[in-house]
């Protein structure tokens, strides 16, 4: 290992990576553990494309891309997409699925901090979906995302609020009652309050543009975007 890479490699939780490695082969199973990600992906994609003024012809980085659900969908919109993840197995699944689908995505196994050291200011759009709550130092990820985007470019984050309601819905409800995601997927202590995320953003060149909640209705079994950021939320920022 190159010695200069060791500090940024510290921002990796190997237990978190192992959780996703164990189920990577089922990433594209529409009825499997990642069914919620497939269900919400059209909402995510629509929000990102609308707020960024379209994706066609743009250079996009998906941080924490996993098996490539969002990365592939952005490539289908005409973007040149790079997917970044530290999980070997999810990336192998992503590469194979892209090959089978005839979609061009460049998948890279390295931390966002490592990538920022080599590719600062090279992306029109950077997305970081449900990744911040899975690393030891989420603020470092925010800083790296700010470094990677071009002036005037867009950076999108999504994560989970930290409060009793989010614990009840995202952990108790989603993992143990509805079994929408595997048990142990989330650790409420790692959830991030919007004020915390905005504080980290304010310490970079990024500026907040819009925030929205992602809501699940268990009665209708549907998802929607709208006001209220008590549980899942998305943040659109722009490089000054």
Swiss-Prot record:
Pathway: Cofactor biosynthesis; ubiquinone biosynthesis. One of its GO terms (biological process) is methylation. It catalyses: a 3-demethylubiquinol + S-adenosyl-L-methionine = a ubiquinol + S-adenosyl-L-homocysteine + H(+); a 3-(all-trans-polyprenyl)benzene-1,2-diol + S-adenosyl-L-methionine = a 2-methoxy-6-(all-trans-polyprenyl)phenol + S-adenosyl-L-homocysteine + H(+). Its EC number is 2.1.1.222, 2.1.1.64. Keywords: Methyltransferase, S-adenosyl-L-methionine, Transferase, Ubiquinone biosynthesis. Pfam families: Methyltransf_23 (PF13489). S-adenosyl-L-methionine binds at residues 44, 64, 85, 129. GO terms for molecular function: 2-polyprenyl-6-hydroxyphenol methylase activity; 3-demethylubiquinol 3-O-methyltransferase activity; polyprenyldihydroxybenzoate methyltransferase activity. Signal peptide: none annotated. Coiled coil: none annotated. Belongs to the methyltransferase superfamily. UbiG/COQ3 family. HAMAP family: UbiG. O-methyltransferase that catalyzes the 2 O-methylation steps in the ubiquinone biosynthetic pathway. NCBIfam families: UbiG. This is Ubiquinone biosynthesis O-methyltransferase. It comes from Escherichia coli O6:K15:H31 (strain 536 / UPEC). The lineage of its organism: Bacteria, Pseudomonadati, Pseudomonadota, Gammaproteobacteria, Enterobacterales.
């Amino acid at each position: 290992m190159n010695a200069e890479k060791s500090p940024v490699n510290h921002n990796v939780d190997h237990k978190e990576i192992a959780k996703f490695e164990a189920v990577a082969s089922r990433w594209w199973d529409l009825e499997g553990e990642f069914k919620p990600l497939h269900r919400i992906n059209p909402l995510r994609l629509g929000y990102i494309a609308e707020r960024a003024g379209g994706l066609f012809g743009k250079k996009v980085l998906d941080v924490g891309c996993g098996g490539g659900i969002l990365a592939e969908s952005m490539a289908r919109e005409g973007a040149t997409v790079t997917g970044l993840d530290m999980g070997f197995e999810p990336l192998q699944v992503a590469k194979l699925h892209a090959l089978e689908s005839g979609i061009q995505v460049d998948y890279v196994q390295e931390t966002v901090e490592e990538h920022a050291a080599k590719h600062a200011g090279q992306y029109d759009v950077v997305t970081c979906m449900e990744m911040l709550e899975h690393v030891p130092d989420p603020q470092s990820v925010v800083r790296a995302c700010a470094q990677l985007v071009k002036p005037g470019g867009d950076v999108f984050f999504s994560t989970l609020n930290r409060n009793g309601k989010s614990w009840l819905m995202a952990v108790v409800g989603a993992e143990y009652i509805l079994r929408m995601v595997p048990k142990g997927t989330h650790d409420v202590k790692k959830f991030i309050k919007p004020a915390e995320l905005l504080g980290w953003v304010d310490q970079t060149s990024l500026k907040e543009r819009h925030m929205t909640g992602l809501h699940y209705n268990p009665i209708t079994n549907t998802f929607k975007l709208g006001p209220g950021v008590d549980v899942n939320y998305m943040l659109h920022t722009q490089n000054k």
